[in-house]
């Protein structure tokens, strides 16, 4: 059996597969937790302590009681932050700003991109799943959630295509 290495569009996920993969996390949201810095790891006490120690400036916003509540809620689940989730479903595994830097066809019109476009604001990314909706891992004490773009026009600052990772052929903007 010969080893076949896919290149170009064949190596990318199709836009509809990215959306299917993203929706899996929504359907199984009880198994997942937002945890800053997590990229798909089981949230044990040791792993959570490591992630907290790795980003002390981020975690300063929470009191020790709030951190305990976050850890209690997250314990045993698979952890993702916003970019970890987008990286898992698209294959672009990096932080939110770098995901945005890799996007093409950027626009401030949040309705201009096709389904599977990236929605962005500084420090956060999510996935447009079409029909005016998006999915993301928003913040601590949350899992994968769905939202309406129309209710978040002041939240997001742009949309773009993750062209090197997603094949948008055949995708429409609704």
PLM regions: where:
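Loop/turn positions that initiate beta-strands
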Residues: 114-117
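Compositionally biased, intrinsically disordered low-complexity segments
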Residues: 7-8, 44, 102, 147-152
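Short coil-to-beta transitions that initiate beta-strands within beta-rich domains
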Residues: 155-165
């Amino acid at each position: 059996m010969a080893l076949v290495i896919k290149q170009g569009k064949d190596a990318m996920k199709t836009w509809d597969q990215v959306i299917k993969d993203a929706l899996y996390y929504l359907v199984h949201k009880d198994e997942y937790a937002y945890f800053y810095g997590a990229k798909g790891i089981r949230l044990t006490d040791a792993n959570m302590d490591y992630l907290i120690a790795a980003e002390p400036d981020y975690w300063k916003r929470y009191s020790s009681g709030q951190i305990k509540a976050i850890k209690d809620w997250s314990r045993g689940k698979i952890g993702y932050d916003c970019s970890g989730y987008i990286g898992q479903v698209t294959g672009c595994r990096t932080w939110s700003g770098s995901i945005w830097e890799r996007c093409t066809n950027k626009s401030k019109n949040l309705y201009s991109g096709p389904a599977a476009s990236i929605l962005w604001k500084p420090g956060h990314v999510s996935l447009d799943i079409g029909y005016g909706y998006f999915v993301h891992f928003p913040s601590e004490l949350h899992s994968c959630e769905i939202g309406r773009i129309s209710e978040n026009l002041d939240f997001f600052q742009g949309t773009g295509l993750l062209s090197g990772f997603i094949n948008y052929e055949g995708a429409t903007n609704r």
